Amino acid sequence: MSTPEITPAAVTFRVPAGTPAGAAMRELGLPNKGPEAIVCVKETEGESAGQLRDLSWVPQQDVEVAAVPANTDEGRGVIRHSCAHVLAQAVQKEFPGTKLGIGPAIDNGFYYDFQVAEPFTPEDLNKLEKTMKKIIKSGQKFERKAYDDVEQARAEYADEPFKTELIADKGNVDPDSDEATEVGAGELTAYSNVNPRTGEVEWYDLCRGPHVPTTRYIPAFALTRSSAAYWRGDQSKAGLQRIYGTAWESKEALAEYQTMMAEAEKRDHRRLGQELDLFSFPDEIGSGFPVFHPDGGIVRLEMEEHSRKRHIASGYSFVNTPHVTKGDLFQKSGHLDFYADGMFPPMQLDGETDDEGNVTKPAQDYYAKPMNCPMHNLIFASRGRSYRELPLRLFEFGTVYRYEKSGVIHGLTRARGFTQDDAHIYCTEDQLEQELTTVLEFIISLLRDYGLDDFYLELSTKDPNKFVGSDEIWERSTEILERVATKSGLELVPDPAGAAFYGPKISVQARDAIGRTWQMSTVQLDFNLPERFNLEYTAPDGSKQRPIMIHRALFGSIERFFGVLLEHYAGAFPAWLAPHQVVGIPVADEFNEYLENFAADLRAQGIRAEVDTSDDRMQKKIRNHTTGKVPFMLLVGGRDVEANAVSFRFLDGTQVNGVPREDALRIISNWIAERRNDQPSSELIQPLVEV
């Protein structure tokens, strides 16, 4: 009988007071090498539950912790942040005089910002990688140091202006910001890279940690690119150079990631959008504001139309609200208190002056709306509501505007102006569980309609330091959300303290064709806005009761979902979404009329069909429409005309010849009507031809 294998991710153990966590870990025989090497521990109880700690950490009292292996998301984050330190050490060694910005771990990698005399070149990155490998091979130790006071830290970083600014801001940075990596809550600390042979400090940096024990715990990394950046993402502040990299628990994991990224580059929706003439981002309009071209407009229309039909069938009422509103509305909703940085500056309207220029009526602030929910609340509150009307489901394709910093804008997936498939549901507490179940089932069903079918759920729960409403209602609603999520049968991943202040949330995460995860849909409970807007309904006993509000957006935004689908399908949309569903390609001009007649029959059934009558040779036409991702290409020559038939050509290069016209019409119309998401091919079409 073989020895059972310990799964590091499942291991919890107690660390006695006065004992380093790493020593307690070693007594258990947990791995310190390979992809499952333990890189840090996580507290599991008390007020510090969820806090990551170095293996060198010595607790003052007995404490239970969980081992964090390298091959977990948290473990990779620690490896990447440690690798960012190695990068910064290498930069200051190779480019003396460089000033340090910040260097956090990010999704799948890390970055570090530097103030340097000249932008980094690809050759510079190659040189830095070599220096980093030497540092990693030397096995430098990461040692934590806590400062007694701010002045001590300020003196130590006197030559680092960006660090001294962070030190001055200690305790006042957004806990979710990248800067919090260095000066978040708790002690002001730094980490030194220590030579294991001499004990000398080779380099140090302001940082909260944690870090891997030594640089040898960074087995695989790569620098990926450099770009311009601004200090703290503010264009009015100093210009910097940012180097991006990635780090993994093994060379195999790094190679797998690099293969996926190479495929992702081919699928980049920004490149495909230009190649397929789907959308653009004109400089004259501004960064983050996409313009959809005719072909992209068709795809978007099909996406919206199918969603609209499904919503109507599911009992949603369509509403429409304006793009701009008075600032008082967002004051009432709390957006100006909690979300002002994400809104565009106000416009001052409705002011009046007399002939001498004296103000007779003060102007009011108007804002482009960042969210639709306040206006939907006004619709609910526009008249008295009865319990018989609940659940009330208000739905809108509502365009919103959010001031995203230029550095985070990314094509369609992170824009400044976008349209949400936004719904707000008002229900009683007794209806909540069934309504959440119905919403989640609807989300999964609709996403599957578009060809996404690999999901897991994430449950975001209360941040004990930032919430409204009673503990009781949070606990009850979180239990309901967890029960609904569990009933779905999908994997449920906890996100402790990840909820917004106004209620717990389930998010649907979808994996695409190359295994990347995208957050698609959110189902968010809200205990805040019904109170702020004094929303009420009349209960059966005649009393006035507060409804529970559910926010939900299935696509996130139309634009983002468009970009995700474009990359998922590598530009080859399913036939029902494709802007050009059928293109006829005559072998010679004499067959144009025959194909035009057949295309007319297809168009009569609502199919987007056309004939390529250009002067290009047939093979060039085939190449053009293959590049254009047309799912059905119909070739016609003399034999086809004689047999009253057409020949199919598919994107994979296969063909089915001599298909009778009636069969071809039936096959194409059924394929599109069924909204099949697979690409047609000879293997799939041949069996559909009647013998």
UniProtKB/Swiss-Prot annotation:
Cofactor: Zn(2+)
Catalyzed reactions per annotation: tRNA(Thr) + L-threonine + ATP = L-threonyl-tRNA(Thr) + AMP + diphosphate + H(+)
Main location: cytoplasm
Swiss-Prot/TrEMBL keywords: Aminoacyl-tRNA synthetase, ATP-binding, Cytoplasm, Ligase, Metal-binding, Nucleotide-binding, Protein biosynthesis, RNA-binding, tRNA-binding, Zinc
E.C. number(s) listed in UniProt: 6.1.1.3
Family matches, as SMART domains: tRNA_SAD
Residue sites binding Zn(2+) per the record: C373, H424, H551
Record-linked InterPro entries: aa-tRNA-synt_IIb (IPR002314), aa-tRNA-synth_II (IPR006195), aa-tRNA-synth_II/BPL/LPL (IPR045864), Anticodon-bd (IPR004154), Anticodon-bd_dom_sf (IPR036621), TGS (IPR004095), Thr-tRNA-ligase_IIa (IPR002320), Thr/Ala-tRNA-synth_IIc_edit (IPR018163)
Gene3D superfamilies: 3.30.54.20, Anticodon-binding domain, Bira Bifunctional Protein, Domain 2, Threonyl-trna Synthetase, Chain A, domain 2
Localization (cell): Cytoplasm
GO function terms (MF aspect): ATP binding; metal ion binding; threonine-tRNA ligase activity; tRNA binding
GO cellular component terms attached to this protein's record: cytoplasm
Cofactor, free-text remark: Binds 1 zinc ion per subunit.
Domain TGS: 1-69
Broad class of enzyme this protein falls into: ligase
PROSITE patterns tied to this protein: AA_TRNA_LIGASE_II, TGS
Quaternary structure (record): Homodimer.
Family membership noted in the UniProt record: Belongs to the class-II aminoacyl-tRNA synthetase family.
Role according to the record: Catalyzes the attachment of threonine to tRNA(Thr) in a two-step reaction: L-threonine is first activated by ATP to form Thr-AMP and then transferred to the acceptor end of tRNA(Thr). Also edits incorrectly charged L-seryl-tRNA(Thr).
HAMAP family named among the record's database cross-references: Thr_tRNA_synth
Protein name, as recorded: Threonine--tRNA ligase
Gene: thrS
